[in-house]
């Protein structure tokens, strides 16, 4: 009961909120220690390819309905979503969230977090960075735990791969225009597994539309 213990014990929900807020700085960069150390730098040609993409800030605003865009300084929205790592809070849970009011102190607080990894980041290293962040920032007034629910390594296509070149030629022949090379932040764990275990490259071709509502209850694909 908050009337009995409020002000004497640290509220887990408030602690979690403070920790989550600290995971990004004012420039949109992730503050986990060493998070960017192994991130592969975009080449001038790669940035030029991103600049060719039809997606601009106006299209992101229209698709999402947000009042303004946000992200890591120094990169375009296309680069942020396709080539830069992210840390996203997927969900928060704590205390009483049902109808009416209850003046209680929550015993626990939980955040589900996902990280988009890019070349050459490794999931095992990012977990260590998260634990180090918690060690450096979590107060001694609470107990905490980091659970690794699932992970997969990064995957990036080699544009000089014969399969990619063949697909490029076929698409240009059919559509009469040079195809765009676009990096996608969505994960397909099997791609990295095929690269690492079988030594084969995958050719990924986007057939979906922004209106397909990926991961939504009404996700669909036009045929």
Regions found by a protein language model. Give the residues of each.
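Histidine/acidic-residue-rich, glycine-tolerant segments that coordinate divalent metal ions
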Residues: 1-10
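Active-site helix-to-loop segments that bind/position phosphate- or nucleotide-bearing substrates
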Residues: 113
């Amino acid at each position: 009961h908050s009337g009995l213990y409020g002000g004497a014990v640290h509220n887990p929900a408030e602690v979690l909120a403070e920790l989550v807020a600290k995971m990004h700085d004012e420039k949109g960069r992730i503050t986990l220690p060493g998070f960017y150390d192994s991130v592969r730098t975009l080449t001038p040609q790669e940035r030029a390819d991103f600049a060719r993409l039809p997606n601009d800030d106006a299209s992101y605003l229209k698709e999402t309905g947000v009042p303004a865009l946000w992200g890591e300084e120094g990169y375009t929205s296309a680069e942020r979503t396709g080539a830069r790592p992210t840390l996203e809070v997927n969900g928060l849970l704590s205390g009483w969230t049902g109808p009416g009011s209850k003046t209680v102190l929550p015993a626990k607080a939980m955040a589900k977090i996902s990280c988009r990894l890019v070349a050459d980041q490794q999931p095992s290293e990012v977990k260590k960075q998260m634990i180090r962040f918690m060690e450096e920032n979590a107060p001694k007034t609470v107990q905490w735990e980091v659970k690794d629910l699932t992970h997969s390594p990064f995957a990036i296509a080699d544009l000089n791969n014969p399969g990619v070149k063949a697909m490029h030629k076929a698409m240009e022949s059919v559509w009469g225009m040079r195809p765009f090379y676009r990096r996608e932040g969505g994960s397909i764990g099997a791609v990295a597994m095929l690269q690492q275990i079988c030594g084969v490259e995958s050719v990924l071709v986007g057939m979906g539309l922004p209106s397909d509502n990926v991961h939504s209850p009404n996700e669909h694909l036009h045929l």
